């Protein structure tokens, strides 16, 4: 067979595939310029920076895991608020039956337009996710949490029964189905997960996450969320500082970290982020115990700086705009190197 005939047959085969499954089903990569990944903000500038692409990617699976009360749900709720701000539709699959509508409202979520499901089993939860992703109308689905996705076999069995690997099989099967429609329809699914300890592990990390290996494989991004210290006001504990590590990233450089402050009943502190990033980028200059902006001392100590930024919207937005400009400059410089 000549080279011309081979090329002709290949061309015919490609045309047939496109006719059957659509123009986007197959292509020669060099014919089409690379498409930038569409993203939406996480609601935190620090997390957006750590992700390397400016936010969570559309049409992908994201896993957020960590110990209890570390801020996983808060991060996910902030993402929902951002999607709604852009006019998108979000769904919250509350397998733990623990969502606090008032807290969600405090974080900026329009609860009147949030789709909520409290499923009775793991199969029901994942079937709902699969159905929603196929509608093309949902931008973000949050599943809270993988550990609470209990298979029917376990729910219907007796306490003494051991259903080994049932949840892992359920997750693996569901993820195969869900992934196929996610990218096509531009829906992002965030799975919140907990941490378990393997029994009998002496060497290495004993920590693992429920749901088997399927989620680790299918997730484009995995975030490890940990509390590092408490935030206090006098004798009262008002929140905690959280370290978020990007342990897997298929779209940018992994292993970057973000530090955020989560304040009880308020969520991620935007003023703390602006104070931190402003100092890191040289927009705010520390002079002893004072912080200076444009050569003028504006606040003594970090606490007073955060309070000033909270109460002075004009200053907050001015510094925020400069941070965004500085980050764009840094990104352009890194691309030219």
Swiss-Prot record:
Keywords recorded for this protein, A-Z: ATP-binding, Cytoplasm, DNA damage, DNA recombination, DNA repair, DNA-binding, Nucleotide-binding, SOS response
Pfam families: RecA, RecA_C
CDD domains: RecA (cd00983)
Taxonomy, superkingdom: Bacteria
Signal sequence residues: none
Subcellular localization: Cytoplasm
Entry GO CC: cytosol
Molecular function via GO: ATP binding; ATP hydrolysis activity; ATP-dependent DNA damage sensor activity; damaged DNA binding; single-stranded DNA binding
Residues holding ATP: 66-73
GO terms (BP aspect): DNA recombination; DNA repair; SOS response
HAMAP family, per the entry: RecA
Entry's family note: Belongs to the RecA family.
Role, per record: Can catalyze the hydrolysis of ATP in the presence of single-stranded DNA, the ATP-dependent uptake of single-stranded DNA by duplex DNA, and the ATP-dependent hybridization of homologous single-stranded DNAs. It interacts with LexA causing its activation and leading to its autocatalytic cleavage.
Protein name according to UniProt: Protein RecA
Organism of derivation: Mesomycoplasma hyopneumoniae (strain J / ATCC 25934 / NCTC 10110)
The organism's taxonomic lineage, starting at the top: Bacteria, Bacillati, Mycoplasmatota, Mycoplasmoidales, Metamycoplasmataceae
């Amino acid at each position: 067979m000549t080279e011309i005939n081979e090329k002709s047959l290949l061309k015919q085969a490609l045309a047939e595939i496109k006719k059957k499954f659509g123009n986007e089903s197959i292509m020669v990569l060099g014919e089409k310029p690379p498409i930038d990944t569409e993203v939406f903000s996480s609601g935190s500038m620090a997390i957006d920076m750590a992700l390397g692409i400016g936010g969570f990617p559309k049409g992908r699976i994201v896993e957020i895991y960590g110990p209890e009360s570390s801020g996983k749900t808060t991060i996910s709720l902030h993402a929902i608020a951002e999607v709604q701000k852009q006019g998108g539709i979000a769904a919250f699959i509350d397998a733990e039956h623990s969502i606090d509508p008032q807290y969600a409202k405090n974080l900026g979520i329009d609860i009147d337009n949030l789709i909520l499901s409290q499923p009775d089993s793991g199969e029901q939860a994942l079937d709902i996710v699969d159905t929603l992703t196929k509608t093309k109308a949902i931008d973000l689905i949050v599943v809270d949490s993988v550990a609470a996705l209990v298979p029917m076999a376990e729910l219907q069995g007796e306490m003494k029964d051991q259903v080994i690997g049932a949840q892992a099989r359920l997750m693996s099967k569901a993820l195969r189905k869900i992934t196929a429609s996610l990218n096509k329809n531009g829906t992002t699914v965030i799975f919140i997960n907990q941490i378990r300890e393997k029994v009998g592990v002496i060497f290495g990390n004993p920590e693992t996450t429920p749901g088997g290996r399927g989620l680790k494989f299918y997730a484009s991004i995995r975030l490890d969320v940990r509390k590092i210290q408490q935030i206090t006001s006098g004798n009262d504990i008002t929140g905690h500082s959280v370290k978020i590590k990007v342990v897997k990233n298929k779209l940018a450089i992994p292993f970057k970290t973000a530090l955020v402050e989560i304040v009880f009943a308020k969520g991620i502190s935007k003023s703390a982020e602006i104070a931190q990033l402003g100092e890191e980028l040289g927009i705010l200059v520390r002079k002893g115990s004072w912080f200076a902006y444009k050569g003028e001392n504006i606040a003594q100590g970090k606490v007073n700086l955060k309070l000033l930024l909270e109460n002075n919207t004009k200053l907050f937005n001015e510094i925020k705009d400069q941070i965004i400009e500085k980050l764009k400059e840094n990104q352009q410089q890194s691309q030219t190197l």
